[in-house]
Regions:
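A short glycine-rich, Lys/Arg-flanked "PGG" loop and its adjoining helix->strand segment in the class I
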Residues: 141-155
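Class I SAM-dependent methyltransferase SAM/SAH-binding core
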Residues: 72-107, 113-115
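Short conserved loop adjoining the S-adenosyl-L-methionine
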Residues: 118-123
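Conserved class I S-adenosyl-L-methionine
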Residues: 1-56, 156-177
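A short SAM/SAH-binding and catalytic strip from SAM-dependent methyltransferases
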Residues: 127-140
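Class I SAM-dependent methyltransferase "Motif I" SAM/SAH-binding loop
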Residues: 67-69
């Protein structure tokens, strides 16, 4: 067997089923949005600082933040780059981003109300794409196709690391014991 013979999308979907994973509807995220904004936006975090440093976004670059939530990365990125496209399927999360956009007078943020499953023909390309903990999708192939079509330079993906979802070997490899 060679790698091209492996259907990674099928394996991924089987894994999601085995973990009893399901995506929350946008209305659940709408309800969580104010508290998440309070707890996450503008708060120091080793994860956030490490990811922003690794992304090394330049002033002349654009960023597409997929699953942007309440603006955890949108706000600091908008303060350092040309433009940020904040995409989320929760209107409540986008409402939080809008509040921060107004508070900090960041006119370089564009809100996009879409899900991974939606048609993305009108989503602009960006130099840098970020999908932080927002890649638990139903169709891995479709996600990869969207990332490829929208990225001009770099893509940064991170995943959730809850124990029920990942193999113990992954935790050992990344040095986590919590």
């Amino acid at each position: 067997m060679i790698i091209n013979d492996i259907n990674f999308n099928d394996l991924y979907q089987q894994h999601l089923k085995a973990c009893n994973h399901y995506n929350l509807p946008p209305t659940k995220w709408d309800k969580k949005a104010p508290k998440m904004a309070e707890n996450l936006v503008g708060k120091p975090s080793r994860y956030n600082e490490t990811l922003l440093k690794a992304m090394n976004v330049q002033p002349n670059e654009t960023v597409l933040d997929i699953g942007c939530g309440p603006g955890t990365f949108v706000i600091p990125l908008a303060q350092q780059c040309q433009a940020v496209y904040a995409l989320d399927y929760s209107q409540g999360m986008l409402d939080m981003v809008q509040q921060y956009k107004e508070k900090y007078q960041l006119n370089n943020i564009t809100l996009l109300h879409k899900s991974w499953a939606d048609n993305w023909d009108d989503v602009p390309q960006a130099d840098v794409i970020l999908a932080s903990r927002s890649t638990l999708v139903d169709d891995l192939d479709d996600m990869i196709e969207k990332l490829q079509s929208k990225a001009k330079k770099r893509v940064f993906l991170t995943s959730v690391t809850q124990r029920h979802f990942l193999d113990e070997g992954v935790f050992e490899a990344i040095g986590r014991d919590d």
